[in-house]
């Protein structure tokens, strides 16, 4: 399956450690969304915005990798899944369930 990574999941070392089967495919800009930081964790999120884009990357991931990401992203409590199409292929990413106010990102970003 295709996965769109943004925020801290762009760290290739971290992705490979967490998702052993993951394969980086390419840089990708998700149009019609913008990057935001929310929640008490000051974690990355994306939200619709027709004039913006989110820098990220496309990865091929296994079902096992998806399950590991679900745990890491606290799915479905903190994040839910968003699907979009890229060249007739379905791509999955995560967006926050509760859209809290903007918070400055953590140092690791």
Protein language model features and the residues they cover:
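Glycine-aromatic micro-motifs
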Residues: 1-109
């Amino acid at each position: 399956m295709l996965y769109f990574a943004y925020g801290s999941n762009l760290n290739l070392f971290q992705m490979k450690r967490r998702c052993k089967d993951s394969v980086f495919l390419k840089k990708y800009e998700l149009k019609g969304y913008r990057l935001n930081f929310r929640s008490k964790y000051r974690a990355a999120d994306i939200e619709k915005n027709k004039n913006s884009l989110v820098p990220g990357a496309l990865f091929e991931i296994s079902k096992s990798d998806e399950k590991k990401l679900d745990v890491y992203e606290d799915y479905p409590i903190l994040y839910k899944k968003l699907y979009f199409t890229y060249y007739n292929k379905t791509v999955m990413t995560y967006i926050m369930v509760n859209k809290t106010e903007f918070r400055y990102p953590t140092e690791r970003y």
